Regions:
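Helix-loop-helix "hairpin" substructures at the membrane interface of multi-pass membrane proteins
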Residues: 131-202
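Transmembrane helix-bundle core of multi-pass membrane transporters
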Residues: 6-11, 82, 90-148
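Hydrophobic alpha-helical transmembrane segments
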Residues: 13-18, 61-66, 91-92, 131-136, ...
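Cytosolic-side transmembrane-helix boundaries in multi-pass membrane proteins
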Residues: 241-248, 252-269
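Transmembrane alpha-helical segments in multi-pass inner-membrane proteins
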Residues: 190, 194-245
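Membrane-interfacial amphipathic/re-entrant helices at transmembrane-helix boundaries
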Residues: 1-21, 269
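Alpha-helical transmembrane segments in multi-pass membrane proteins
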Residues: 15-24, 45, 49, 53, ...
Length: 269
């Protein structure tokens, strides 16, 4: 337990908890609404904002947040048009973001930037500014879902029913897309662009093995996500491997154990 004496590890633990709250809440909506592919597109589109930030000399996380939100709105708008399929709209922003990110990164003045931190992440490098960002996002998400859980659940399961109940579906969908983009960007320092989509889906998949209740999946996802981060952190420390990859590995291991355990229980019963 000597690790707990180090400030960087304390930051990593607190960041894991806050990120688990944010990912557990918005990830449940993503999985229920079947927006995993869209979220993957937004994740990779954020690379364009990172490249733009490096080129302009501003915070890459700030520029990635703006770029991701605009990309999310763009995907949502294009997918509503009759002349373009949703998967095609996602592909446009996915590839555009990656292309712009690479171009701007190499056009940045001075030495070529190290992009691995943004591609693969390192939770041990998060600082107080990152913690404040995660904390504010987790607080806003918690409040938003607490106040509007009923319309969110209605939209997630049946948009047409939600419309029949006079719920402003389009407004909620744009707001939720914004939250998806901001959550992805807020956690880039943890697992990076390549692996971020996993934190939005694996804890929810594991929770879904035990319950179909939207609210219960949120709570279980937060706990499972935090457990995955803790296990990944200790694997990273003892095996000297990247923390982002080890977090995802341990999260998938939890899912596999739960899946096998549930199957064994079914056979015995």
């Amino acid at each position: 337990m000597d690790l707990l004496q180090y400030t960087f590890f304390q930051h990593a633990l607190l960041g894991s908890l806050l990120a688990s709250i944010a990912y557990g809440i918005i990830g449940t909506y993503i999985v229920t609404r079947r927006l995993v592919f869209i979220s993957g597109g937004i994740t990779h589109a954020s690379f364009g904002g990172i490249g733009l930030g490096l080129f302009a000399g501003i915070s890459p996380i700030l520029s990635a947040a703006v770029f991701s939100v605009l990309s999310a709105f763009g995907v949502e708008w294009l997918s509503r048009r009759k002349d373009m399929r949703e998967d095609s709209a996602i592909a446009v922003f996915w590839t555009l973001g990656m292309a712009l990110g690479i171009m701007f990164s190499f056009l940045s003045p001075g030495f070529a930037p190290d992009l691995s931190a943004y591609l693969f992440g390192n939770i041990l490098t998060i600082n107080q500014a990152d913690l404040w960002m995660l904390g504010i996002l987790a607080f806003i998400l918690t409040g938003f879902f607490y106040l509007f859980i009923r319309p969110i659940v209605s939209i997630a399961f049946d948009r047409e029913f939600a419309r029949s109940q006079k719920i402003p579906v389009e407004v909620f969908e744009y707001v939720l897309m914004m939250f998806i983009a901001l959550t992805i960007v807020a956690c880039l320092r943890m697992v990076g662009i390549v692996l971020a989509i996993s934190l939005l889906t694996i804890p929810q998949m594991t929770a879904n093995l035990f319950t179909y209740s939207f609210k219960k999946i949120i709570w279980l996802s937060i706990g499972i996500g935090f457990l995955g981060c803790l296990g990944g952190l200790f694997i990273s420390y003892h095996w000297k491997v990247p923390s982002g990859a080890s977090i995802i590995f341990f999260s998938i291991l939890i899912y596999a154990v739960c899946k096998i355990g549930k199957s064994c229980c079914k056979k015995q019963s």
